[in-house]
Amino acid sequence: MSCARRHAVLAYLGERAWTQGVTDELPEVPRDSLLSARVSAARLAQLARWELDRARRVLHAVEIPMIALKGVAYLLRGMPHAATRLLSDIDIMVPRSSLAEAEKLLHAAGWRATNLDPYDQRYYRQWSHEIPPLQYPGRILALDVHHTICPPVSRLRPDPEAFWAASEAHGDSGVRVLSPVDSVLHAAVHLFFDSDFDGRFRDLVDLHELLAAFSADDAFWHDLVSRAREQGLGRPLYYALQALSRVLGTPIPTATSREALGFRPPLPVALWMNRTLAEVLAPIDPQRWPPAHRGRLWLLYVRSHWLRMPAHLLVPHLVRKSLRKGRQYSADV
């Protein structure tokens, strides 16, 4: 239970137990823990819908279009696993041309930037794919406003206009969601190119559930590979399919796996990455980590930064972050 809680899948397990009708067979303590997690996740899902609607009203008033991303988008789609995610923020995307106006309007409506450090402000505005996170005073969920899904200085540079063109309207609310294949590719990018890997099993579960939901469409797998090739996102898709197969046993059509090999890095790199990703993404209690586990996490952390920024920006960025951590440690001591 502690491992499931650490990896933020306790509510997910509770939902699975409930839908399979085995809840009453569980001992009282774990049953109560699963129920509590489901209730907490459902409450956060309710807050996420409300927070999204507040932002929608502000932007819709001046006809700024908006795409809901990740967790809140899964809620809008009514995906079964969506209400089991422990959300800490909601993510939206607006056109780059409307970004400054959107930020100004949200500030006027009461949202405030949560990070006022001058360097971090510069980092977000010059090199990131989003503005600094916003928070409405007294509310739980932060608001992340994107203009694309990858940093503009990163090695992955998909065309955001293509995402807009393929996006789908959610009823008559004015909110849009990414197409099924773009939703999967965004989740793959977020996990395999845009974050560290400690405690990311939850994100792998997201990908598993997305594929389970969308693959009912006969054209999905072909469209997924084609879209990855078109947007230059084949490498994260390759890693995603490999990790899903190895860690969760997600069924991947043979033809799709074969096509995805065209996105594979050189064989020695692929062998190391596939083995390492399977190890660090597995839901293992930190007390049982093998000796080399922390070293692998560190290498993947450096890799994610290397992919997000060119060397002339990355080196001073990491030096600055290290110095800041050193000062924080000294202050704490």
Residue ranges and their predicted role:
Residues M1-S88, V94-V333:
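Conserved NTP-donor binding/palm subdomain of two-metal-ion nucleotidyltransferases/polymerases, i.e.
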